[in-house]
């Protein structure tokens, strides 16, 4: 047999001299359901970075606002201003999103949207409709569960201008960042180690608990949010698409915002809105 010369050898044959077909199969090694490039430690780093950023930026925004815009105003009163809350929230989202990208692209040199399986789905309107259907279905639970009559979150809707700003966040940056962390980072790490069922459950659980302060630690409201998390994570698992779970989340929040705006005459009479769960 004539030896293969370097002049005639293809690049692939030099890089991979042994064909994959020659390698013996591994029947006892099933393919991983999820195999993200990042690890659980990376997810913990993102979580820690989020807490640190929340603490630092909220303080900076409050002191900056008192110095530049509201001189002499009590910090406790400033903390209740929706505009400042939204500003700090926007800055937190931007910082955390940048850190997420640095973890994926800087550490693993993989495109961010590919690594988290964004995979924008073709059936967008159906997923938005699924979110709306989920809202009407879960809304029935308020007749069987103890729901709070007054929540810290609803107080942010006291003025129409603030309500519209919050509604905008509720259908854009809010669900985007929550889906990126919970369904983009946390779920695939859990599913790889524990399987799909446990991955869905353990992703939805902290998703629900995270919203406890917004609803006065009422377990009925937290249970509803937990179920929203279950549905969104199940969609992510079934379609292998964070974009799909994002659309379901937007459909849920968006339907609720539209209904609330209609019932309250443009957020002017919030007492007619009923119970709001985002």
Predicted segments — roles?
Residues 71-74, 107-111, 123-126, 159, ...:
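Alpha-helix capping and helix-coil boundary motifs
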């Amino acid at each position: 047999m004539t030896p293969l010369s370097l002049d005639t050898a293809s690049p692939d044959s030099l890089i991979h001299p042994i064909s994959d077909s020659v390698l013996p199969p591994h029947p006892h090694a099933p393919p991983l359901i999820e195999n993200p490039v990042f690890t659980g430690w990376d997810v913990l780093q993102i979580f820690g970075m989020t807490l640190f950023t929340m603490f630092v930026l909220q303080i900076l925004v409050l002191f900056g606002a008192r110095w530049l815009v509201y001189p002499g105003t009590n910090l406790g009163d400033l903390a209740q201003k929706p505009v400042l809350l939204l500003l700090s929230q926007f800055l937190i989202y931007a910082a955390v999103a940048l850190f997420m990208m640095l973890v994926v692209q800087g550490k693993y040199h993989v495109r961010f949207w590919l690594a988290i399986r964004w995979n924008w789905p073709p059936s967008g309107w159906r997923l938005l409709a699924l979110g709306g259907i989920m809202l009407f279905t879960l809304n029935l639970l308020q007749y069987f569960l103890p729901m709070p009559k007054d929540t810290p979150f609803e107080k942010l809707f006291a003025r129409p201008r603030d309500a519209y700003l919050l509604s905008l966040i509720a259908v854009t940056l809010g669900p985007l960042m929550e889906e990126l962390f919970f369904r983009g980072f946390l779920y695939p790490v859990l599913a790889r180690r524990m399987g799909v069922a446990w991955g869905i459950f353990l992703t939805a659980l902290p998703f629900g608990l995270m919203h406890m302060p917004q609803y006065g630690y009422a377990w009925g409201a937290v249970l509803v949010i937990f179920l929203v998390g279950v549905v969104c994570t199940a969609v992510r698992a079934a379609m292998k698409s964070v974009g799909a779970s994002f659309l379901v989340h937007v459909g849920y929040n968006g339907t609720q915002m539209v209904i609330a705006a209609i019932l309250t005459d443009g957020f002017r009479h919030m007492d007619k809105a009923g119970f709001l769960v985002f």
